[in-house]
Curated annotation (Swiss-Prot):
This is Potassium channel toxin alpha-KTx 1.10. The lineage of its organism: Eukaryota, Metazoa, Ecdysozoa, Arthropoda, Chelicerata. It is found in: Secreted. GO terms for cellular component: extracellular region. Keywords: Disulfide bond, Ion channel impairing toxin, Neurotoxin, Potassium channel impairing toxin, Secreted, Toxin, Voltage-gated potassium channel impairing toxin. GO terms for molecular function: ion channel inhibitor activity; potassium channel regulator activity; toxin activity. The record marks Y35 as: Aromatic residue of the functional dyad. Reversibly blocks voltage-gated potassium channels (Kv1.1/KCNA1 (Kd=79 uM), Kv1.2/KCNA2 (Kd=547 nM) and Kv1.3/KCNA3 (Kd=492 nM)). It comes from the Eukaryota. The record marks K26 as: Basic residue of the functional dyad.
Length: 37
C-alpha cells in the first residue's frame, strides 16, 4: 500500500510504478494499493 491520496486508479499507476517497478494498482478508499508486492 502506498500512502498517497488518489481520486482515480490512473493516478496510482504512476506511483505504483515508482514504488514497485510495475504499474499495477488501484485507488481504494482514496489511497493507492499496489500489487503485487
Amino acid at each position: 500500500e502506498v500512502d498517497m491520496r488518489c481520486k482515480s486508479s490512473k493516478e496510482c499507476l504512476v506511483k505504483c510504478k515508482q514504488a514497485t517497478g510495475r504499474p499495477n494498482g488501484k485507488c481504494m478508499n482514496r489511497k493507492c494499493k499496489c500489487y503485487p508486492r
